[in-house]
């Protein structure tokens, strides 16, 4: 069973450890220094495997295809040989823009089969087009030796159309396509450092949606990102009354996801510090992914 504390530690504060091989300057979330060219990133959290990224082309430019190679190394600097499938994928890559208008959740499997050679090298490829200039957080979730890890970096993308500031919309009732979604909290004030329970309610055409479907072996995938891009948390939802033997939906655990559920999905989050956070939620209905976004203030 996965170690709960490992997941929490890395979700609270972890930059990508190792190298980011890109000519475009990048800034570690906890070290606001640029690292142009082939420069080694300072290690913020030495625990666990080291994640190394390389981009092709090296200069990241808005609107152009980018091949991102992700390598995972053990403490000896060798390819990590004990990676574990987590929520149906070898690893999860979350990309979000600083203004929160861009969000992607992708996997190596989206671009082809994961081969034995890839596993042996612990090296995987994803492709992405950053749509506009500015700062993006790139989060990577994976499991090794039965422990879950979340690491991230901030990348700066060059281009002519820079992004603006996030729109501060704190409404708890929103419409996403044909779906009306509400977000409720046990406490009106979301507190930092404590487990906060949030509840999503889904309806369509005035009727509760009771036939939501599992998405990557979870009721919901939630990416919680602070407005300063200083925190990245990846959590998973729970159906009220569903028995969980794991970590409140966090990462990989032993739980049974019903074939159909709704209209409520619960989400437990520990916000590491005060500030503003965007919560991106992904659920599946009738074969399609519904992306929700809620901005919350944490005191």
Describe the predicted segments one by one.
Residues 18, 25-299:
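Intrinsically disordered, low-complexity terminal tails/loops enriched in metal-binding residues
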